Amino acid sequence: MKFIGAHVSAAGGVENTIARAQAIGANAFALFTKNQRQWQAAPLSEASIHAFKLACEKGGFRPEQILPHDSYLINLGHPDPDGLAKSRDAFLDEMKRCEQLGLCYLNFHPGSHLKQIPEAASLKLVSESINWALERSQGVTAVIENTAGQGTNLGWSFEHLATIIDGVEDKSRVGICFDTCHAFAAGYDLRTADACAAVFAEFEQTVGFQYLKGMHINGAKCTFGSRVDRHHSLREGNLGEAVFHHIMNDDRFDGIPLILETIDESIWGDEIRWLRSLAKA
């Protein structure tokens, strides 16, 4: 079964995300468990935790249908020791919040070398940061998102992702979230059926589908290989529709959250219905 949804607002409390997902016909969703642009956040209240779990149970949302995202400030490959420590502490707090909510994934961008250390050294720090957080948490898988490769961001190539995973000691608690827009921007062509088949074959060979824990389903305002991160609605922009047909008809993408981060939330319901219509009977 395909679990399709969107990154919905947690305004007013994380317990409100379930109703927002249901309102667009989703059977998956993503959320921030705290303000994504601040380092510090108030702890989750017991009332909010209970209400979230109850709403998930009533709505039929299991943990594997939910893909929380961490703060954009966190850089697990930070070249500065103080910046790295601050990022690790914040990441662990995010892991603990997922634990409290009974969730099993935490999606994150791997980090940036900031032109201060070699790429390989920063990738090693990301792996070490994941190990550090996994040792101090339970039950939550660290889900690395492929990036567009903008600026000094790591994680734009499948080789980067494989290198990070290789350095993680507990392979059962690390995974990948594949973003269609980011892959396209990073130079992975997804504009035809044959191109999609080739890219996903390369992903299988380099990373492995056993690590795929979620996807971000996005169109692209950016051009191919531009290394610029600009999302678009599914049926607009430069990516085209072939990749969405492929995903909806490939059972390797069953049973994981497929999350819209497209730019017009007023049509998320329409985009979810359109995706479902692509599945061949």
Curated annotation (Swiss-Prot):
Name the chemical reaction catalysed here: Endonucleolytic cleavage to 5'-phosphooligonucleotide end-products
| Binding annotation for Zn(2+) 2 | E145, D179, H216, E261
EC id:
3.1.21.2
Q: GO BP, one example?
A: base-excision repair
Which residues does the annotation say bind Zn(2+) 1?
H69, H109, E145
SMART domains assigned to the protein according to its UniProt record, in alphabetical order: AP2Ec
In the record's cofactor note, how is the cofactor described as bound? Binds 3 Zn(2+) ions.
**Which GO MF terms does the UniProt record name?**
deoxyribonuclease IV (phage-T4-induced) activity; DNA binding; DNA-(apurinic or apyrimidinic site) endonuclease activity; phosphoric diester hydrolase activity; zinc ion binding
| Keyword list, A-Z | DNA damage, DNA repair, Endonuclease, Hydrolase, Metal-binding, Nuclease, Zinc
The record's PROSITE patterns line, in alphabetical order, gives: AP_NUCLEASE_F2_1 (PS00729), AP_NUCLEASE_F2_2 (PS00730), AP_NUCLEASE_F2_3 (PS00731), AP_NUCLEASE_F2_4 (PS51432)
Top-level division of the source organism's lineage: Bacteria
Which residues bind Zn(2+) 3 per the record?
H182, D229, H231
Pfam families attached here?
AP_endonuc_2
Return the CDD domains for the record. AP2Ec (cd00019)
InterPro entries from the entry? AP_endonuc_2 (IPR001719), AP_endonuc_F2_Zn_BS (IPR018246), Xyl_isomerase-like_sf (IPR036237), Xyl_isomerase-like_TIM-brl (IPR013022)
Identify which cofactors the protein needs according to its UniProt entry: Zn(2+)
The protein's job, in short, is: Endonuclease IV plays a role in DNA repair. It cleaves phosphodiester bonds at apurinic or apyrimidinic (AP) sites, generating a 3'-hydroxyl group and a 5'-terminal sugar phosphate.
Tell me the HAMAP family matching this sequence. Answer: Nfo
Q: What family is reported?
A: Belongs to the AP endonuclease 2 family.
The identity of this protein, by name, is: Probable endonuclease 4
